[in-house]
């Protein structure tokens, strides 16, 4: 293959997380592993950091979130894409966080809760 290559060194990745951790303390830290870990394998990258305290993994699609869960990742996972009514049941099954960006999303969550008694953790996205 011709072109640039990027190498991920797990020890350096962990050191970078600890450097950030020294600045933010014990707050939760969101680590983006969407697009297959930007070509490095989402499960590979997530596995390196899964044992670190306070890590939330962020992906773009529910398929990526399910891939992490099925790959053994137990950390909290936030789906960046706008919540879709048709996959709310899977967010409960896989213990995923959703991104609500409109009143329509909140209404769908209320309806889902009224029908099932369950509701995923919600990240509210506001355009300012």
Indicate residue ranges for each PLM-predicted region.
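Gly-rich Lys/Arg/Thr-decorated short loops/hinges at beta-loop-alpha junctions or inter-strand turns
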Residues: 1
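Active-site-proximal beta-alpha core segment in soluble small-molecule metabolic enzymes
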Residues: 4-8, 12-15, 24-128
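N-terminal nucleotide-binding beta1-loop-alpha1 segment
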Residues: 21
